[in-house]
């Protein structure tokens, strides 16, 4: 962030050194290649690939589809949601909307579900039960319906689920200051519940003035609610 007063000469601080960024060239990155190798050898069952935005989940699904040829059906909340996947899949994409797929008798060796967290869990459960192998991809970042409940509820109920995570950004360089600023602004970093609470519990009333007097407190509360899969939305921040 740069603060410039009109009466002063602009002074631009030196940016911290960051690794060079190179746009994706269609070939799998290191993390993608390692996961792709395991998915190709996946025994009958369900695999899930989760990551923050811009890490190449949909691209990975498209690469898998290209290798599978015509042995897979792709579904997603909307046809437009698989545009990235389709760009990596080549001519092998066979897409069906979730409800249409459920009503049909279509069969395939694989089912690939992009943005799986946006599909109602009962419908998703029926779909995955019909195919020998299923790949689910979703983000775990953001508000209700974008992934956190998918991890806490749906994935936790699947026996022998194989989980994979992509951490290296592909759409932008590692350490991108804009990504960090947006994550902080929209409170994307949920409470991970890594440490058990210690000591006695204290009940305390919280009001809107906390944003001015104790800004860390309402932010921590929001992270707690989001991590616990409460129905969070942007409006809560100003409630």
Where are these regions (language model features)?
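Conserved coupling/interface region of RecA-like P-loop/ASCE motor cores
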Residues: 1-25, 155-194
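N-terminal pre-P-loop "Q-motif" helix
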Residues: 23-43
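Conserved RecA-like ASCE P-loop NTPase motor core of nucleic-acid helicases/translocases
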Residues: 50, 70-82
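Conserved lysine of the Walker
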Residues: 57
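Hydrophobic positions on the alpha1 helix immediately C-terminal to the Walker A/P-loop
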Residues: 60, 64
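Conserved RecA-like ASCE ATPase "motif II neighborhood" in helicase/translocase motors
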Residues: 91-129
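Signature of the SF2 helicase/ATPase Hel1-core->accessory helical subdomain module
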Residues: 122-161
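Conserved helicase/translocase motor-coupling segment
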Residues: 203-239
């Amino acid at each position: 962030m740069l603060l410039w007063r009109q009466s002063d000469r602009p002074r631009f601080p030196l940016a911290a050194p960051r690794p060079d960024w190179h746009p994706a060239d269609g070939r799998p990155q290191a993390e993608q290649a390692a996961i792709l190798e395991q998915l190709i050898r996946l025994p009958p069952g369900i695999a899930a690939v989760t990551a923050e935005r811009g890490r190449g989940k949909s691209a990975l699904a498209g690469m898998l589809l290209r290798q599978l040829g015509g042995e897979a059906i792709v579904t997603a909340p909307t046809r437009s949601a698989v545009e990235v996947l389709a760009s990596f899949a080549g001519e092998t994409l066979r897409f069906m909307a979730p409800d249409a797929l459920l009503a049909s008798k279509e069969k395939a060796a694989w089912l690939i579900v992009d943005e799986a967290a946006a599909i109602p869990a009962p419908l998703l459960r029926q779909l995955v039960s019909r195919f020998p192998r299923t790949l689910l991809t979703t983000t775990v970042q953001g508000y209700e319906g974008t992934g956190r409940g998918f991890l806490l509820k749906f994935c936790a109920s699947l026996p022998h689920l194989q989980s994979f995570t992509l951490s290296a950004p592909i759409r932008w360089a590692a350490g991108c200051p804009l990504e960090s600023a947006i994550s902080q602004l929209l409170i994307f970093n949920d409470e991970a519940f890594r440490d058990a609470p210690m000591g006695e519990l204290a009940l305390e009333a919280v009001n809107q003035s906390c944003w001015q007097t104790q800004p860390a407190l309402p932010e921590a509360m929001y992270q707690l609610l989001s991590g616990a899969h409460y129905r969070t939305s942007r409006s809560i921040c100003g409630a």
